[in-house]
Amino acid sequence: VTHLFKTQNHIFTTDDLKLTLQNLGIKKGDILYIHSEIFNFGIPMINLHDLQKNIIDCFFEIIGNEGTLIMPTFTYSFCDNKVYDKLNSKTRIGVLNEFFRKLPGVKRTNDPLFSFAVKGAKEKLFLKDTDSCFGKNSVFDVLTQQNAKLVLFGGRYVDHSYIHYIEEHMKVSYRFYKNFSGEIIDENGNKTNKDIMYYCRHLDINSETTIESVLKMLVQDNNIQSENFANAEISIIDIKRFFETGTKVLAKNEKALLKQENKNAMCIQ
């Protein structure tokens, strides 16, 4: 047993973490898509490298060899006119994600804007090339088909990028397809040119979804379970249900999840 975090009156161990994950219904064979903010938890009791390694190990112990772990490693490279170097382009979101992608056996997807790191029994399903960041065969598409679970590790406000998959599926009018081109360097140092479509926001109109409105939808649908752990929360969301509810809500009113919209627009009838 390894000590992970301490709070004012308690020490949280790897056993505590595994129990918390099991209490959330995580089990052998699960496909987990994890967004994390590990600095929301208590005071680390071991160095950052060991802390991150122990957290990843806990997840794999619960989901087993038959499970699959996925984390976003977004770089937005082509948006910034940069080369996407699969080995060396740092992720812009979260230290745990960056740690995970560098572990032995972890593969990274080819998307030069929204890449993901993946390891596990079903990793091949997630490594397909796609024409559009959030379109057919994208990681979000496969997560939905495979009944994966979204884990918010460190609080409910960690991320809501999955909503963009729903927005693209519904072809909301406040977004549009834009082509991005650039150069990819693969694991072996080979360079290729790549084009990819990204369903971007129209910046001149109200087009920004808020985490609050997405959360409200998930709570109303009873599709977010949370457990307290070391002064923060670990939450789990059923991705397929997220998709089904999100498409219903946007079919009724495509602006329902946007900033400054009518607060009553969010009923799921």
Predicted regions and their residues:
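N-terminal and secondary-structure boundary signal
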Residues: V1-Q269
